[in-house]
Amino acid sequence: MSRGPEEVNRLTESTYRNVMEQFNPGLRNLINLGKNYEKAVNAMILAGKAYYDGVAKIGEIATGSPVSTELGHVLIEISSTHKKLNESLDENFKKFHKEIIHELEKKIELDVKYMNATLKRYQTEHKNKLESLEKSQAELKKIRRKSQGSRNALKYEHKEIEYVETVTSRQSEIQKFIADGCKEALLEEKRRFCFLVDKHCGFANHIHYYHLQSAELLNSKLPRWQETCVDAIKVPEKIMNMIEEIKTPASTPVSGTPQASPMIERSNVVRKDYDTLSKCSPKMPPAPSGRAYTSPLIDMFNNPATAAPNSQRVNNSTGTSEDPSLQRSVSVATGLNMMKKQKVKTIFPHTAGSNKTLLSFAQGDVITLLIPEEKDGWLYGEHDVSKARGWFPSSYTKLLEENETEAVTVPTPSPTPVRSISTVNLSENSSVVIPPPDYLECLSMGAAADRRADSARTTSTFKAPASKPETAAPNDANGTAKPPFLSGENPFATVKLRPTVTNDRSAPIIR
């Protein structure tokens, strides 16, 4: 394909402009993209390092397992191998920055200046040569015009030959300049592309070596890694032997087995005794809902010796919900006979009414406790005479001592504060009339208490007469002796009641 000098000249100039207007700006963009690539790879290497550090930590956890120790070591080795490969990749990308990014940055600044100067020099020389050629051609035309109308033709002919030679030499010179300029421009362009290819080939060689090194390293370790996780349900022989020993233990106990403490053994004996009792006895009904009614005169029927056990029993009942095993341990520590059931004696009559889960009894009856623990003021026991079982208020009974007789004891004031303190002078043989207990009618009791408080405000100088010991008082419906002052007058006219604050879960506070 033949081209004229002007066409070649245009190709030369377009080549220079292509380098300056397309290649160099593209190179600048490539440098920016390469820097972003570097940042991404560095971030990937850091993230990979953190990831494989986590793999190593999990491997350390696995090494503590009796069946996964080998897998733990494999995880640690995988972590170290990949971190080593990441370090090698980091070194390769340092070369990428040094051999490509840094070199391109250095070349681009120099090349812009060089290409501008080269193109300008080419255009200037081409213009000068072209002007010289045109000037010689103009002189040749002038000589030819003069020689045509002149008589001395030989004189102009000699000059014409000289100008023709000059024009020819200058045409050859300018053509050679255009050809050399075009070649130089194309080579300059090629050198730049070649430089870019050469730098990336060098980096590719580093990456190739990195991949060969990685493949060699992974090929030497990967089969052994895969072998450790082929059978996930395989248990090491040592662990299997240990499991078999646990399945078939020897006849002699292990010397290092801890023995139970004596207190726990005694608590277990008590618990077994209660379990045996619950198995042999019929099914126990649930305790009534609500707290049992507490008689305000209960302490008057307790001996000093029995008042403390009663208070202890109330205290123990309040702490029952906290820890049953503790109360059983305390019962054992107090010396109670575990094999002997506790008995109580009734001090007030009690009527069950229509509730089949409650127990009815009269005053002075003996009840065997089937459950020695109170539940909200209720006890569960069996009547010694009727053999009936049921729940009853604990405040209607007192502990039965072995040497206690059936005689009525003298009521003594309780050492602990009671809800009301009477100033009536009661004789030793007289007894207080006890109203029929009915714990279900709390509202009627509250009204009766209000009426007694109103009657206490009236001023009366009545004093209860002492009953004669030689005359026996008749019994009322409750089984208690009828006092001689039941003549319709108020026996508690001189009683002054102190204001109290009653809390169902605590003793009254006297102000």
From Swiss-Prot:
Q: Where in the cell is it found?
A: Cytoplasm, Cytoskeleton
What assembly does the database describe for this protein? Answer: Interacts with RAC1. Binds to F-actin. Interacts with FASLG. Interacts (via SH3 domain) with E.coli effector protein EspF(U) (via PXXP motifs). Identified in a complex containing at least WASL, BAIAP2L1 and E.coli EspF(U). Interacts with E.coli intimin receptor Tir.
State the taxonomy lineage: Eukaryota, Metazoa, Chordata, Craniata, Vertebrata
Q: Per the record, what is the consequence of mutating residue 146 to E?
A: Loss ability to induce the formation of actin clusters
Its BP terms in the Gene Ontology are:
actin crosslink formation; actin filament bundle assembly; plasma membrane organization; positive regulation of actin filament polymerization; regulation of actin cytoskeleton organization
Q: How is it modified after translation?
A: Phosphorylated on tyrosine in response to insulin.
CDD domains in UniProt: I-BAR_IMD_BAIAP2L1 (cd07645), SH3_BAIAP2L1 (cd11913)
Renumbered to this chain, the Polar residues biased-composition regions fall at: 303-328
A single Gene Ontology MF term assigned here is:
proline-rich region binding
Q: What is this protein called?
A: BAR/IMD domain-containing adapter protein 2-like 1
Listed SUPFAM superfamilies: BAR/IMD domain-like, SH3-domain
The coiled-coil regions, if any, are 115-154
Q: Which GO terms describe its cellular component?
A: adherens junction; cytoskeleton; cytosol; extracellular exosome; nucleoplasm; plasma membrane
Kindly give the InterPro entries that the UniProt entry links to this protein: AH/BAR_dom_sf, Baiap2l1_I-BAR_dom, I-BAR_dom, IRSp53/IRTKS/Pinkbar, IRTKS_SH3, SH3-like_dom_sf, SH3_domain
Residue ranges for the region (Disordered) are 302-328, 451-511
- What residues does the IMD domain cover? 1-249
Q: Mainly localized where? A: cytoplasm
The species is: Homo sapiens
Q: Where is this region: Binds F-actin?
A: 483-511
